[in-house]
Amino acid sequence: MKHIRNFCIIAHIDHGKSTLADRLLGATQTVTAREEKAQLLDNMDLERERGITIKSHAIQMEYTYQGQEYILNLIDTPGHVDFSYEVSRSIAACEGALLIVDAAQSIQAQTISNLYLALENDLEIIPVLNKVDLPSANPEEVSDDIIDLLGCKLEDIIHASGKTGFGVENILAAIIEKIPHPKGNIEEPLQALIFDSHYNPFRGIEVIFRVKNGQIKKGQKIKFMATGNEYFADEIGTLKLNQVPKNVISAGDVGYLISGIKEAKEVKVGDTLTDAKTPTTNMIVGFEDVKPMVFAGIYPVDTDDYEELRNSMEKLQLNDASLVFAAESSAALGFGFRCGFLGMLHMEIIQERLEREFNMTVITTVPNVSYLAYTKKEPEVGMIVNNPTDLPEPSKLDRVEEPYIKATIITKADFVGNVMGLCIEKRGVITNQTYLTTERVELNFDMPLAEIVFDFYDRLKTVSKGYASFDYSPIGMRTSKLVKLDVLLNATSVDALSALIHESNAYHIGKKMCEKLKELIPRQQFDIPIQAAIGAKIIARETIKALRKDVTAKCYGGDISRKRKLLEKQKKGKKRMRLVGNVEIPQEAFMAVLKLND
C-alpha cells in the first residue's frame, strides 16, 4: 500500500489536462505507441468533437522510480463549471492533485474554485505550469501568480508541456515523493467509496470504486449500504486502458466491479460498498448529492416513445449522477419529463447524448430555475416551483423567492467596464473588485441564477473578447418581483412556452418572443395572433398573416355581386377554420426562445 498513489488533475477548460494525461500514460508505458491518440481518456465521441472532458475517467499506471515499482491511479476530471460535481467526486477518491495552469492564460476562475475544493479535502497540491513551449507563454509572471495563490516556493512549480512531453518525468517524480500514500487498514471490514458507474448493455452496471479499508475478493458477497442490496462480485479488476481482471483489490487501490446489476436505481454514486457477512458500520462521509440548477421539460417528438425515453434517461442517469428527472405532462406536448441539469452546457450535452446514444429525438422546453412561492394563505410555507405552470395565481400569491449566486469573474483590466455593464443588465450587484495584477481584475457580483442560465456565458465571452473566465456558487434565496409570462397562440395558451421573468424585463422579452415566433411558425390558411400576456393583460402582439387563395380568379367580367358572394363565402370558411384550426409549433421555435438576443 505504501507504493500506491491516487491523484487527480484539476485545471480550467483548455489548460491542457487531457493532453498532459496522454503524456503521463505514454511515459509510464500504460499505452503502447500504437494505441496512443489525442484525448485518450475522453472516450465519448461528443467529448472528442467538442474537445472537452465531460466525465471523469480513472486509469491505472505502473512506474518504476529509483528501483521501486509504484502504482499510480490517475483520475482525469472535467474543467467546465457545469461539471464541477464530477470534479468533487474525483477529489473525494484521491490524496493529491496536479494543479495545471496554462503559461499563456494564467490562473482562471475555474482553477481557483477547483483548487478550493481540493484544499477542503486536504489534498497535496502539485503546481504544474503547462504549455511553456508556446510563443505567447509568460512563465515568470504566471509563476508569481501561482505563488500568490498557493503560497508555495518558486522551485515547487514544475514546468511542463503536454505537447512535447517536456517535464513529464519531473511530474511523475513529484507525484511519488510529495503525494502521501493512501491510509487504510487491510485487516478491517471492507469499506469502499463508489465514485462512478457506467452502463454496459451486455454485462449490466460497472461500478468504479476506491477501497478505503479492507479488501474485496472475486466471488465475495458484497452489500451496497445506501440501498442495502447484496450481490456477488462476479468480476473485479483494475482499470488500465482496458479492464484487467484481478482476484483481489486491497485498501488504497481503485478498481471496477461487475455483478450483473441491471437496475439503474440500485447503484448510487457516493455510496459505500462493504462485505455482506461482516459489514462495516460506518459509511464514508463527506459526499453530498448534487443539486440541479436548471430545469427544463424533455418530451418525445412522438408520444408513443415515452417509455423508451424513460429507459434512455435511466441509463444516462447511471453514467451521469447529476441528471434528475420526474414525469410530467403538458397540454401542448403530451407526456414527458421535467429534468434537472447543472447548467446549459449540461442540458445541451444530455440532449445530444439522447440523440446519439439512444436515437431519441426530443423537444426541450424553455429552461428555468427552481423558485420558492409563498401564498397569502400560508405566508410562512414555501412551495418549490420547478415549472412555471405550477405557480399559484397572482391573486393568491404573496411573494416569490429566486436563487441567487455569487459570481466570480476574472478578466483583463481593459474589459472591466463591458463586463460590469453586462452584469448590471442581468440584475447583478457588484460586491467586490480586486486587482490581482495590473492587468487582471477579479470582480464579484451577487446575481440571480435565472439570469445566467440563458446566454450569459456566451455574452461574457463576447464583451471580453474571450478573455473573461467565470465561476459561480449558490448563496441562497431572495425575494424578487417575478411575473409569469404566457404565450398565447390563436388565443390558447401554450404551456410549454411559459416562463417566469422579472417584472422589469417582461415587456422586452414578451415582444421579442412574439417576433421570434412570428418568424418560425409556418403560415396557415387563417390569421394567427401571437400574444404575450401577464395574467389577463396582453403586453405584446404579432400576427401571422393568412395565406390566401384567389377565389375570384375564375370570374372574368360580369357582375361584382358574383365576386362578392365568393369572397363572403371564403371569409366564413376562414372564420370557421380559425375556431377549429390548431397551430403546430416547430421544434426550432422552442429552442429559439432561448436565444432571444441573436
From Swiss-Prot:
It comes from the Bacteria. It is found in: Cell inner membrane. One of its GO terms (molecular function) is GTPase activity. Residues 2-183 form the tr-type G domain. It is a peripheral membrane protein. Its main location: membrane. It catalyses: GTP + H2O = GDP + phosphate + H(+). Keywords: Cell inner membrane, Cell membrane, GTP-binding, Hydrolase, Membrane, Nucleotide-binding, Protein biosynthesis. Gene3D superfamilies: 3.30.70.240, Elongation factor 4, C-terminal domain, Elongation Factor G (Translational Gtpase), domain 3, P-loop containing nucleotide triphosphate hydrolases, Translation factors. GTP binds at residues 14-19, 130-133. GO terms for biological process: positive regulation of translation. The keyword Nucleotide-binding applies. GO terms for cellular component: plasma membrane. Its EC number is 3.6.5.n1. Belongs to the TRAFAC class translation factor GTPase superfamily. Classic translation factor GTPase family. LepA subfamily. PANTHER family: TRANSLATION FACTOR GUF1 HOMOLOG, CHLOROPLASTIC, TRANSLATION FACTOR GUF1-RELATED. Required for accurate and efficient protein synthesis under certain stress conditions. May act as a fidelity factor of the translation reaction, by catalyzing a one-codon backward translocation of tRNAs on improperly translocated ribosomes. Back-translocation proceeds from a post-translocation (POST) complex to a pre-translocation (PRE) complex, thus giving elongation factor G a second chance to translocate the tRNAs correctly. Binds to ribosomes in a GTP-dependent manner. This is Elongation factor 4. The gene is lepA.
